[in-house]
């Protein structure tokens, strides 16, 4: 859901680089997407901070501190407050992926595919 949210914000021009901070806009888009895709009663909580960290294990997503340092396992705390995360963290997605996502047709197809994966994962 976080990828869908980030890709949507890229499409809206609200994320204009492959490097971006953990922002209120991303959180709001995540919550909007969550509410649209995840039915009420599902035992998961809408917290964009969790996938922000989990995506760090993917080769196309890197998490950095505000001073540009890579986040290591000791500092890696997925439960950090949203306020602290907004202040201290940035993500960088692969430059080639970012350029692909700029294409409206490709972005729409990828978002549709990711949404179908979410629905399948929730058995909808």
Segments and roles (model prediction):
Residues 1-124:
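Intrinsically disordered, charged low-complexity linkers and terminal tails
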């Amino acid at each position: 859901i976080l990828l869908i949210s980030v890709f949507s914000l890229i499409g809206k021009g609200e994320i204009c680089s492959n490097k971006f901070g953990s922002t209120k806009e991303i959180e709001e888009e995540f919550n909007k997407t969550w509410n649209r895709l995840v039915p009420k009663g599902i035992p998961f909580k809408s917290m964009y901070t969790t996938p922000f960290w989990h995506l760090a294990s993917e080769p196309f997503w890197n998490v950095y501190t505000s001073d540009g340092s890579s986040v290591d396992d000791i500092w890696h705390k997925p439960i950090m407050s949203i306020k602290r995360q907004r202040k201290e963290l940035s993500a960088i997605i692969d430059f080639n992926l970012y350029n692909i996502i700029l294409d409206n047709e490709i972005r729409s197809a990828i978002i549709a595919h990711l949404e179908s994966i979410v629905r399948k994962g929730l058995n909808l």
